[in-house]
């Protein structure tokens, strides 16, 4: 059975009875086919029994929680079953060594830049960011790398804006709260992508709290933020572009809140449905010579990072060809 992500938008109760997990809400009680669940995303107010959590942990199923506004709150991360002390040592060494850390930080951003270029080409704009990549290669500090990344994104959003409908202009990238509909859509998709990357990291031997571009902090899986630099343009931005240009997402799917604009419940439902479909879409992998899902591409990227950390093969970021 092919496993899929489960999204819970309504309020309810998640509990275990014998060897079955049930979700109960105002519409009734429904058993969940646990063997077909990859991970769970909870947007409603959901109570969970300890027995259900124990069972989900045994099955290696991560749960990701989002607040009332659709932003990521945190994860229930089952005990890791894939351990490698050797990899942990190498992962930390690459953080502590300034040159090794800087190399990886640059590669994550270069991957993101090239995927932004590819998006613009698909949006009918042939702009190249080669001058930024040259500048990036000359950076000697992480803060300098982040500065270049910020300027590239500002230019990218400006160029992307030229192709967007009048009702869905970015104008200026704003967050928490986003100031218009397009900013709200981009932020919501980025917030959904981040825990999807966390799930993939859980299924590798990597330690998700040790990162290179983003500074490791308590209470966040910062390695997922590193990898998101590559996948935000490839998955979140491209999906946002399609949703507004095809009229799938409209003004009616948003609400004014907290001095900003947010997706309403119906808008969240529509976006999440399309996001899950997007993650399950397959592309023909040029090197593997077979079809892989976009979700799987994230796992493969993590495996490439493992090979770099243990000295098997230098990491090269994924650049979209599809």
Swiss-Prot record:
Reported cofactor(s):
Mg(2+); Mn(2+)
In its UniProt record, which GO terms are filed under biological process? defense response to virus; maintenance of CRISPR repeat elements
Q: Which Gene3D superfamilies match?
A: CRISPR-associated endonuclease Cas1, C-terminal domain (1.20.120.920), CRISPR-associated endonuclease Cas1, N-terminal domain (3.100.10.20)
Q: What class of enzyme is it?
A: hydrolase
Keyword terms, alphabetized: Antiviral defense, DNA-binding, Endonuclease, Hydrolase, Magnesium, Manganese, Metal-binding, Nuclease
Binding positions for Mn(2+) per the UniProt entry: 149, 214, 229
What are the recorded GO MF terms, alphabetically? DNA binding; DNA endonuclease activity; metal ion binding
Please state the Enzyme Commission number of this protein. 3.1.-.-
The domain of life is Archaea
HAMAP family under this entry?
Answer: Cas1
Note the NCBIfam families from the entry. cas1 (TIGR00287), cas1_HMARI (TIGR03641)
Q: What does this protein do?
A: CRISPR (clustered regularly interspaced short palindromic repeat), is an adaptive immune system that provides protection against mobile genetic elements (viruses, transposable elements and conjugative plasmids). CRISPR clusters contain spacers, sequences complementary to antecedent mobile elements, and target invading nucleic acids. CRISPR clusters are transcribed and processed into CRISPR RNA (crRNA). Acts as a dsDNA endonuclease. Involved in the integration of spacer DNA into the CRISPR cassette.
Under the heading PANTHER family, the entry gives: CRISPR-ASSOCIATED ENDONUCLEASE CAS1
Q: How does it assemble?
A: Homodimer, forms a heterotetramer with a Cas2 homodimer.
Which family is it part of? Belongs to the CRISPR-associated endonuclease Cas1 family.
User: Which named protein is this?
Assistant: CRISPR-associated endonuclease Cas1
- Please name the source species: Methanocaldococcus jannaschii (strain ATCC 43067 / DSM 2661 / JAL-1 / JCM 10045 / NBRC 100440)
